[in-house]
Amino acid sequence: MTHSLTFYHFGRALVLSLVWLLASCGGGGGSSNTPPSPAVTVPPGANVQALRVGPGPAGSGRVVNLLYTSVRLCVPGSSTNCQTIDNVLVDTGSAGSLPLPLVKVADQQLYNCVQFIDQSYMWGPVATADVYLGGTALDGEKAASLRIQLAGTTGAATAPSVCASTGFTPITAVSDLGANGILGIGPDREDCGIDCEFITNNGYYHVDQGGGDLTGIAISRAEQLLQPVTRFAANNNGTLISLPAVPSTGAASATGALIFGIGTQANNAPGTVSKMAPNPSGYFATTFDGRTL
């Protein structure tokens, strides 16, 4: 028996980090007997973002059950100096040659570090972009002047040991990540929060004092990597992910939708659902194969 999947995220965070790489796009082909790709029917709207489960960008070997979307970035204030980034990984975080303005603190370049549970990390300078999501032309929702991390940037200062901890592997290429960037859905409005406001050696934010000499820096929550959804003018109180049923034999790919807002439009009414509130760390307990996780 198969079931379609619909996930509601109430007040969840979306922190955007992008791999700064020039990479060709596309995926592998399938044979003529490949089963059709399941899809869900979602009413169109400016708050609807297309999702795809399937092959990732060329050069990537990590293509199993990854959820991809596209993001449009523009130089702040411009509607023409823009670039669409395909094969961006949607997670519960290649900009080509778009000249985004880098963020400096007291004339020193600001850097950001993010570590993942699989003992990998992303490191790069912080830049500012207008981020567009939703709508058929990725022009439905706008997060203006959003700070993002540009991982894999040529010429960037080397990550400090607090970021590149022993045993951690850097993500600097499409082949490392299996995507051109990350659009992460997490439990917080910022990537670090209150700790980074008052703690200098917070592990997240650093400034280059010259010649690659890095030092930790405290950053206010308003100046951290913020979630794009809360910066939207409307449809900014949560997200909904809708994916189709997939037969037990599997499918080569599937398409779904990321819908912005909860109960703000006809296409995002939650109906009767079970609400599961996360703990302060963003986790909740579940049971799998007789084990509580």
Roles of regions detected by a PLM:
Residues T2-V15:
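Bacterial N-terminal signal peptides that target proteins for export
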Residues L18-A46:
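Bacterial Sec-dependent N-terminal signal peptides
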Residues W20, N87-L89, N180:
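Residue-level signal for helical boundary/lining positions with a hydrophobic bias
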Residues S37-N65, A144-L150, A157-L293:
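Aspartyl protease catalytic domain
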Residues V63, C74, S79-I85, V90-V162:
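Signature of the N-terminal lobe/flap region of pepsin-like aspartyl proteases
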Residues Y68-Q83, Y283-L293:
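A short acidic-Thr-Gly-centered motif at the start of a beta-strand
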Residues V71, A127-V131, I241, T286:
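Short acidic-hydrophobic surface loop/beta-edge motif
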